[in-house]
Amino acid sequence: MIKLVLFYFFSGLSLVSASIVISVKNPVFSVVFLILVFFNVVGLLLLLGAEFLSLLFLIVYVGAIAVLFLFVVMILNLKFIELRSSFFYYAFFGSLIMAIFLFEIFIILNSDLTFASSYFLERKRIWVQELYSYTNLQILGNVLYTSYSYLFILSGFVLLVAILGAIILTLYQRSQIRRQDPNVQVVRNFDDTIRFFKFLK
């Protein structure tokens, strides 16, 4: 009974916080409520018995990404920027994206994961029978490196492409921008560095 009450509490609070994230105009408040959503999801994962996933979610999303978003928003001082477009302009695209998302969920539930089961779930194991012989981390690692090994490698390639893209963007330099050259600064003569100018009165 207590777990059911906690489940409804965390799920309801997460839904309310998520709605505030997309409805509030102040970006600082939006990021704060996003952090609250992450905390509620951590509570739901703890109720499901996934301690490792909950702590990983807390460290990665709350401790790194959400705090980074909050610092960036506070540094850029975006809280006074007003929305130039109307509400119906954003509501149309938001409704379109939500309809596509719900349609994809409907297809996945009706297809019973036929694509995933035919390629990745052939070697699945009944983990309920071995619940007391394996820890949560061992079960997660076994499933990740056996049944979902292809998806794990694909996610690694996605991260590699993101890293290479960031490096390529930083390597591009414009010729019009003046930059400091340490080699030129070191070899300069002291006599040519300091110059005295006399101003006529």
UniProtKB/Swiss-Prot annotation:
Disulfide bonds: none annotated. It is found in: Mitochondrion membrane. It catalyses: a ubiquinone + NADH + 5 H(+)(in) = a ubiquinol + NAD(+) + 4 H(+)(out). Its EC number is 7.1.1.2. Its main location: mitochondrion. The keyword Electron transport applies. GO terms for molecular function: NADH dehydrogenase (ubiquinone) activity. The chain crosses the membrane at residues 4-24, 28-48, 55-75, 88-108, 151-171. GO terms for cellular component: mitochondrial membrane. InterPro entries: NADH_UbQ/plastoQ_OxRdtase_su6, Nuo/plastoQ_OxRdtase_6_NuoJ. It is a multi-pass membrane protein. Keywords: Electron transport, Membrane, Mitochondrion, NAD, Respiratory chain, Translocase, Transmembrane, Transmembrane helix, Transport, Ubiquinone. It holds the Pfam family Oxidored_q3. It is an enzyme of class 7 (translocase). NCBIfam families: PRK06638.1-4. Core subunit of the mitochondrial membrane respiratory chain NADH dehydrogenase (Complex I) that is believed to belong to the minimal assembly required for catalysis. Complex I functions in the transfer of electrons from NADH to the respiratory chain. The immediate electron acceptor for the enzyme is believed to be ubiquinone. Belongs to the complex I subunit 6 family. This is NADH-ubiquinone oxidoreductase chain 6.
